[in-house]
């Protein structure tokens, strides 16, 4: 459709649609070939108050519902993407509107959850019922957290979702000082057992990703490892600079490597929200570096509130 004058941004940015009296297509089959990156999409983040207010005024909901997400999914598809991490500051993609996940499946969008939302659960699902679930601490609250994780897998077992594994602290924070690689390896082991039990398939047959975001990369550098089928998701420094790339030995990891990249960031030591701080030249250079080092299984772009 873009070749006949329909911009991917025709709805979001009111991009004019070129009108034709007739459209002609040559006989035969034409293809651009497979995309260079298998899973590629966006992360809606830092969405309040701008996007949340706009959704309330446009769609009449206090959450991102399927009518809103259908527009986002269409944009992703028109931009040749196939994946998304949904907004999570105050919304819960799965719980707020059960038709959200159904719409993603119908439109061919592969869903995931962010680096601190394991096992297909949105953080708000925990935060809204903190009294029921108890402390976000695997050392002291293992049974409740395993139940929380299991419920997420029960809901996602018949989807194409990519399951985030591992665990960070409560609400996009580092884990407590007592956390160590042995605890995190135990968490991953138990999560994969839940995946196996719920799906009735070997865990290796269910796509999973481990995000080496912020302090989690330190665990990896200290020697923590996950099974060979898991996608290893490297990250930038939140301002568009790649922190590390896999060496020659690491590039043999069968699960492949991914990149989580920011053009929007809210956090210490400074925000980059609403600031055009990521130059296209820098982004091109850094992502070319990413691809050249074999990071081509999954790319996710944090676009803020879109």
Positions of PLM-derived features:
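Solvent-exposed alpha-helical segments and adjacent loops
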Residues: 1-53, 57-78, 91, 170, ...
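Structured mid-domain segments that build the active-site/substrate or prosthetic-cofactor binding neighborhood
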Residues: 77, 82-85, 91-92, 99, ...
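N-terminal accessory/precursor segments of enzymes
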Residues: 1, 35-51, 55-62, 69, ...
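General beta-strand structural signal in soluble alpha/beta enzymes
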Residues: 44, 85-86, 111-113, 165, ...
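The substrate-binding groove and active-site-proximal loops of carbohydrate-active enzymes
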Residues: 1, 45-66, 81-92, 126-145, ...
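Gly/Pro-rich turn-and-neighbor structural signature
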Residues: 14-26, 88-89, 95-106, 130-254
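Catalytic or ion-translocation cores adjacent to nucleophile or general acid/base/metal-coordination motifs
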Residues: 94-136, 144-149, 284-293, 303-306
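A generic structural motif
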Residues: 7-15, 113-120, 203-212, 235, ...
